[in-house]
Regions:
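GHKL/Bergerat-fold ATPase module in large chromosome/replication-associated machines
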Residues: 118, 136-158, 178-182, 188-621
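GHKL (Bergerat-fold) ATPase N-terminal catalytic module, capturing the glycine-rich phosphate-binding loop
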Residues: 1-179, 183-184, 192, 425
Length: 621
């Protein structure tokens, strides 16, 4: 087959342009990414050798080999892993089908240091090699194939694929280094970078180099060159080591390599269990959220091993989805090596490991919560996701409630339910909360006024998930939850019922409101829980389901709501005497617009509102 030329997809071209011209900070991470990719290829081959009958007889010692030529300014990374065929090369190294390129580009901030730190997290690590290389040659052969292929590119919009000769399965990547980056073709530089980032890659990494010695003295001195191949990493699964052997630095360096994250984790949990079940877990709580945390197709951050043999890294059942930000490893001694991913979903051993792991992780989060400043670093990126557990994890619901934090009417900072309950007033029977789309609008809600008169605090819930999970939370520490906008809550305030004579007096005015707003509202009611506000938009029918649909990205048709009026307000008292129908209509619409502003913070038809306001002002002046 002759050389076939292909064009990179548009997003790949943008990415390569950034790699070549912009992201100069921390260039050395390219080697971390290529070694990590090689390790993944070895993991995948190990898994296939356990599950594919045709490959069970393969006798392979998995390893990664690095070599360099300082004269030619080349660096080569070679593995004997799963390898790639022609389609794999096109898909993985030419399109965005299997990478996070689009997400990476949208996440760029313009800060070179921060942006270079994103490379590994978005699955675009291979392209980081173009930061140091002006040409890359990939030679690869898939373990299930017969033909080897070469992929060549200078990163300038195109790449070529051709057939080549390669006996062993696996991938060999040769970088032709730029002049200014030729120092990476040196023994000490490679050794230093590997020890920094890839010390605990669970496969041996060998470095081939030429060792020069001098024998004799004076004119008789001879230069003797000897080619050597040394293992330069520990190749130890860090999670299998004794905690007493490890330092904080070891855990953090392993995290940075494992999670492709240059930042330090907030915390880690290393646990070894022996008894009826034997397994080891090492979990990390990151300091920042994964880029895909709120995507349906998020990638699990946990890898499953059986007796140190990699099984899968895309099983979302290893931990519940509300802990999807957690990174780490589960290594079981009891699962069969040839376990399939389908069997994993019903496996009792894994279910027990999962249950115990969740408790360990929640306990660690509880430890973080004891330091308010430190907990804020956790809660800001992960608090919304943690709330999701209230819907599905009934076993740990009480623990989750302890860990959640909320804004409230009386506090500027986030408060726990324990803190809220400690400040309950003497006659207060419930924990009150108010749902809305915006914290500032919730703080301005007229509904809060009657609660304020009683001295009752109200939790203000503005996260999208709140409307879905909170109605399913009945109580905390034997104290019931109540939606502050519901009639049961308002009854607890001891408000007097609106008398029939008041209803009779407002009957005609309410009818005028209904006639003017018939296309906008479901109906009009007099309210006894408003103080300074004239009007308020009531609850949306099926609010919980509507909010859930919005959260899932589905369009929700606008539903009509009830308009609540304050019969004690001076404006309504004056409107009772208004006989000018045109002027009354303008006032009614202005009051409705005001209520909509309190609810949404904006109006759909600002032009009409402005015209009505000008008309009323003109008549008043």
């Amino acid at each position: 087959m002759s050389n076939q030329e292909y064009t990179f997809q548009t997003e790949i071209n943008q990415l390569l342009d950034l790699m070549i011209h912009s992201l100069y900070s921390n260039k050395e991470i390219f080697l971390r990414e290529l070694v990590s990719n090689a390790s993944d290829a070895l993991d995948k081959l190990n898994y296939l050798m356990l599950t594919d009958e045709k490959l069970k007889g393969l006798n392979i010692t998995p390893s990664i080999h690095l070599s360099f030529d300082s004269q030619k300014k080349t660096l080569t990374i070679k593995d004997n892993g799963i390898g790639m065929d022609k389609n794999d090369l096109i898909e993985h190294l030419g399109t965005i089908a299997k990478s996070g390129t689009k997400s990476f580009l949208s996440a760029l901030s313009g800060d070179k240091k921060k942006d270079s730190a994103l490379i590994g997290q978005f699955g675009v690590g291979f392209y980081s090699a173009f930061m140091v290389a002006n040409k890359i040659v990939v030679q690869t052969k898939k373990v299930t194939g017969h033909q080897a292929y070469a992929w060549v590119s200078d990163g300038r919009g195109k790449f070529e694929i051709s057939e080549c000769v390669k006996e062993e399965q696996g991938t060999e990547i040769t970088l032709f280094l730029k002049d200014e980056d030729s120092h990476f073709a040196s023994r000490w530089e490679i050794d230093s970078v590997v020890k920094k980032y890839s010390e605990h890659i669970p496969f041996p990494i060998f470095l081939t180099y030429t060792d020069t010695k001098f024998e004799g003295e004076g004119d008789n001195q001879k230069e003797i060159k000897e080619e050597k191949c040394d293992q330069i990493n520990q190749a130890s699964a860090l999670w299998k080591m004794n905690k007493s052997e490890l330092k904080d630095k070891d855990y953090k360096e392993f995290y940075q390599s494992f999670a492709h994250d240059n930042s330090e984790p907030l915390s880690y949990i290393h646990n070894k269990v022996e008894g009826s079940l034997e397994y080891t877990t090492l979990f990390y709580i990151p300091s920042k959220a994964p880029f895909d945390m709120f995507r349906v197709d998020y990638k699990s951050g946990v890898k499953l091993y059986v007796k140190r043999v990699f099984i899968t890294d895309d099983d979302k059942e290893l931990l519940p989805s509300y802990l999807r930000f957690v990174k780490g490893v589960i290594d079981s001694e009891d699962l069969p090596l040839n376990v399939s991913r389908e069997i994993l979903q019903q496996n009792k051993i894994l279910a027990n490991i999962r249950s115990a792991s969740v408790k360990k992780i929640l306990s660690e989060i509880e430890c973080l919560s004891k330091d308010e400043k430190n907990y804020h670093k956790f809660y800001e990126p992960f608090g919304k996701v943690l709330k999701e557990g209230l819907y599905g994890d009934f076993e740990n619901k009480e623990k989750l409630l302890e860990l959640l934090r909320f804004y409230s009417k009386d506090k500027e900072k986030l408060v726990s339910l324990k803190e809220y309950k400690e400040n309950l007033k003497e006659n207060q029977k419930s924990i009150y909360y108010l749902l809305g789309e915006n914290l500032d609008l919730l703080k301005a809600s007229p509904l809060l006024e009657k609660y304020a008169q009683k001295g009752y605090d109200v939790l203000l819930l503005s996260d999208e998930i709140d409307a879905f999970v909170m109605p399913g939370v009945n109580e905390y520490d034997k104290t019931p939850f109540r939606d502050a906008s519901h009639s049961e809550s308002l009854k607890e305030l001891g408000l007097e019922e609106i008398h029939d004579e008041v209803k009779d007096r407002f009957k005609d005015l309410m009818k005028a409101f209904e006639e003017n707003l018939k296309d906008e509202i479901k109906g009009v009611e007099l309210s006894n829980h408003l103080t300074s506000a004239v009007a308020l938009i009531g609850d949306e029918p099926n609010a919980m389901m509507a909010n859930f649909m919005r959260q899932m990205g589905q369009s929700v048709p606008e539903s009509k709501k009830t308009l609540e009026l304050n019969p004690n307000h001076a404006i309504l008292q004056k409107l009772l005497k208004c006989e000018d129908k045109e002027q009354l209509s303008a006032f009614i619409w202005l009051l409705y617009d005001g209520a909509k502003l309190l609810e949404k913070g904006a109006l759909k038809d600002a032009k009409s509102f402005n015209e009505r306001l000008n008309s009323v002002l003109l008549k008043a002046l």
